[in-house]
UniProtKB/Swiss-Prot annotation:
GO MF annotation terms: diacylglycerol O-acyltransferase activity; trehalose O-mycolyltransferase activity
UniProt gene name: fbpB
Region of interest called Fibronectin-binding, as start-end residue ranges on this chain: 98-108
Inducing stimuli: Expression depends on the two-component regulatory system MtrA/MtrB.
Signal peptide: 1-38
Name of the protein in question: Diacylglycerol acyltransferase/mycolyltransferase Ag85B
Length: 325
């Protein structure tokens, strides 16, 4: 192959990616974080509380949906997708997660809000369509919230689980990588597990722009900046930390083929098919690094849709009970 052919191939691939993104991302970002499932709220009568938890780092109170697992219980933190709303957490809107954990002995913690945040501490103010706010979600989830819950709801401040889908899949792994005392368990469903690689920053930036008007550079800095936080927040890069911590991890991703659960629309199938590659590579690299405390579930079906994530969470409950105690 000549040098010119290589260049042509390189630019052809880049143009293909750009064209696909331009055509599909308006639909994709509507499903990043999942297609909604109408009427999936947990049934009335569950002991769910709506808390307002102070966040000094973000300068405001953060709404948290909470269900106690009993005095001194450990907690499962369920993190939302890219289009996280300010009224309810997507896990409650689209699944019966609270009911799954009723009488399990585990508390459920659902932070509300954080659209396009990747649950990260941003480099700069998060400026979007509705103005600017401070995003210090990592600080909130690993310091302010667990300490508040320990003091006010008798929830264990350490030894908990972080589980997320889509943007929050990578976030859950990063929280556990850097805060192994807080999170001994990390679950990722259809997560973007190599966000600093190739054209992922480009796609993430476009998605964040559509989901609230945010900019990826405000979050982690320019990718070309050696001091940017892209690699710091890349689960693939942080595999050695997860292995050294002996974090229990559960990684799920479909292949873009729908089954009886549905989710056969083009955005849901395309995005899951796009995501599976980094998930498989993450598994291979994790095992090669000596990791031996993980579950990897890559079925021959599944799309970027809440129906699949709800089913996977249900499958995780016994493992969460065993590990968290």
């Amino acid at each position: 192959m000549t040098f010119i052919d290589k260049i042509r191939g390189h630019w052809a691939r880049r143009m293909t990616v750009a064209a696909v993104a331009a055509l599909l991302l308006p639909g994709l970002v509507g499903v990043v974080g999942g297609s909604a499932t109408a009427g999936a709220f947990s049934r009335p009568g569950l002991p769910v509380e709506y808390l307002m938890v102070p966040s000094p780092s973000m300068g405001r109170d953060i709404k948290v949906q909470f269900q106690s697992g009993g005095p001194g219980s450990h907690a499962v933190y369920l993190l939302d997708g890219l289009r996280a709303q300010d009224d309810f957490n997507g896990w409650d809107i689209n699944t019966n997660a609270f009911e799954m954990f009723l009488d399990s002995g585990l508390s459920v913690v659902m932070p509300v809000g954080g659209q396009s945040s990747f649950y990260s501490d941003w480099y700069q103010p998060a400026c979007g369509n509705n103005g600017c706010v401070t995003y210090k979600w990592e600080t909130f989830l690993t310091s302010e919230l667990p300490e508040w819950l320990a003091a006010n709801r008798d929830v264990a401040a350490t030894g908990n689980a972080a589980i997320g889908l889509s943007m929050a899949g990578s976030a859950a792994l990063i929280l556990a990588a850097y805060h192994p005392d807080r999170f001994i368990y990390a679950g990722s469903m259809s997560g973007f597990l190599n966000p600093s690689e190739g054209w992922w920053p480009f796609l993430i930036n476009i998605s964040m722009g559509d989901a609230g008007g945010y900019k990826a550079n405000d979050m982690w800095g320019p990718t070309e900046d050696p001091n940017s936080a892209w690699k710091r927040n890349d689960p693939m890069v942080q595999i050695p930390r997860l292995v050294a911590n002996n974090t229990r991890i559960w990684v799920y991703c479909g292949n873009g083929q729908p089954n009886e659960l549905g989710g056969g629309d083009l955005p849901a199938t395309f995005l899951e098919g796009l995501t599976i590659r980094t998930n498989e590579t993450f598994r291979d690299n994790y095992i090669a690094a000596g990791g031996n405390n993980g579950v990897f579930n890559f079925p021959n079906n599944g799309t970027h849709n809440w129906a699949y994530w709800g089913r996977e969470l249900q499958a995780m409950v016994p493992d969460l009970q065993r590990v968290l105690g």
